[in-house]
């Protein structure tokens, strides 16, 4: 089996190293990851300049490249360079990736990119103190999250994903053990309420930080509720077709004030 591994924390992240060790038991692991921290880069691609690749020694990997680009760049580079894969994994991320805000996450977006190429994909994230989310994982124990990654990846490689599921978004609580239960969940509506804080520089000019206020109330059945309230491993099936499952007649009535039942064509 050929497995692509990437992340958004960078190729030197301890979370990526833990993922290599877990996945190497299942197949050949090809690592293509950003050379530097690229959290919150979403599904951005580098189109305005060339990207450069550097061979990096990653124990347990079949081959490893660091890319001076985004996580999505890494997936595109890997497929162009090495062909398709049986599975793509993004992680293990420092910090959870929950709710519809996974579209901001470089971790989740890399898995989404791989799934657009027809590759079953998994994004896996470990809940950690926010102060550790921009480091390389020093002092963080990834063993339990690696256990769940190996377990879930093995199941996907053996049985595939159900029809209509393109990727799995997995979040592991910081206090999880190998006996922690898993929950199949849906995305919460929101995890953060973003706003802007103003500061003044030494010359008296304003500058701004985008900051997120945590949302505390989550509906049962969501990924945020499973992780934050039930302390379970959340597994959310994702379909990259974001078309709303709505009766088109109702939307036509909103847009045009009439339905097809009147005989009117649109």
Swiss-Prot record:
Keywords (alphabetical) are: Cytoplasm, Hydrolase, Metal-binding, Nucleotide-binding
Coiled-coil region:
none
- Gene3D superfamilies tied to this protein: Survival protein SurE-like phosphatase/nucleotidase
The reaction(s) catalysed by this protein are: a ribonucleoside 5'-phosphate + H2O = a ribonucleoside + phosphate
Q: Which cofactor does it need?
A: a divalent metal cation
**Where does this protein reside within or beyond the cell?**
Cytoplasm
The family database entries (InterPro entries) matched by this protein are listed as: SurE, SurE-like_Pase/nucleotidase, SurE-like_sf
Entry binding sites for a divalent metal cation: 8-9, 39, 93
Q: Name one GO cellular component term.
A: cytoplasm
As recorded in UniProt, its EC number(s) are 3.1.3.5
Q: From the UniProt record, which GO molecular function terms apply?
A: 5'-nucleotidase activity; metal ion binding; nucleotide binding
| Manner of cofactor binding, per the entry note | Binds 1 divalent metal cation per subunit.
- Protein origin, superkingdom: Archaea
NCBIfam families the UniProt entry points to:
PRK00346.2-1, surE
Q: Which HAMAP family match?
A: SurE
Q: Which PANTHER family match?
A: 5'-NUCLEOTIDASE SURE (PTHR30457), PHOSPHATASE, PUTATIVE (AFU_ORTHOLOGUE AFUA_4G01070)-RELATED (PTHR30457:SF0)
Similarity section: Belongs to the SurE nucleotidase family.
Q: What does this protein do?
A: Nucleotidase that shows phosphatase activity on nucleoside 5'-monophosphates.
Its name, as the record gives it, is: 5'-nucleotidase SurE
- Supply the source organism for this entry: Thermococcus gammatolerans (strain DSM 15229 / JCM 11827 / EJ3)
